Amino acid sequence: PVGWESSRRHSSLTTQLRVWHAANEELGEAFESSGGFTLPSGAIRSPDASWISRQRWDGLTPEQRTTFPQVCPDFVVELRSQSDRLSSLQEKMREYLENGTRLGWLLDPKHRRVEIYRPGYDVEVLENPVELSGEDVLPGFVLNLRKVWG
């Protein structure tokens, strides 16, 4: 469990993703932190928020959907809490990319800093951004960071 402030931030993050998802269900499926994935490397991970494309979701059997399926999310978000070591989260973000993630955001509320991870590119660091775009991975999704930062 996390403290109330971290819980509020998680709630804002997942609510914004779910609202976008509700209007774009044909594109894929969104998940919050209790949903786990078995990455192709064999590691089991549960990002704070994630999304997989409809094509990849439809490729899973009904049985696989009830477990931690062997699939890496197309999109992941990790939200740093007070107890998280930044280096551990950065390692996790690199692991997601190595296993097939197409877009990843590491949000650090304490420093109001975002690291954006994309395959084949250096990590992009933003200081105190107000919003983030889902780019071509989540078309039309914009995360309002003012609601996450609080």
Task: Name these PLM-found stretches.
Residues P1-G150:
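Gly/Pro/Ser/Thr-rich low-complexity, intrinsically disordered segments predominantly at protein N-termini
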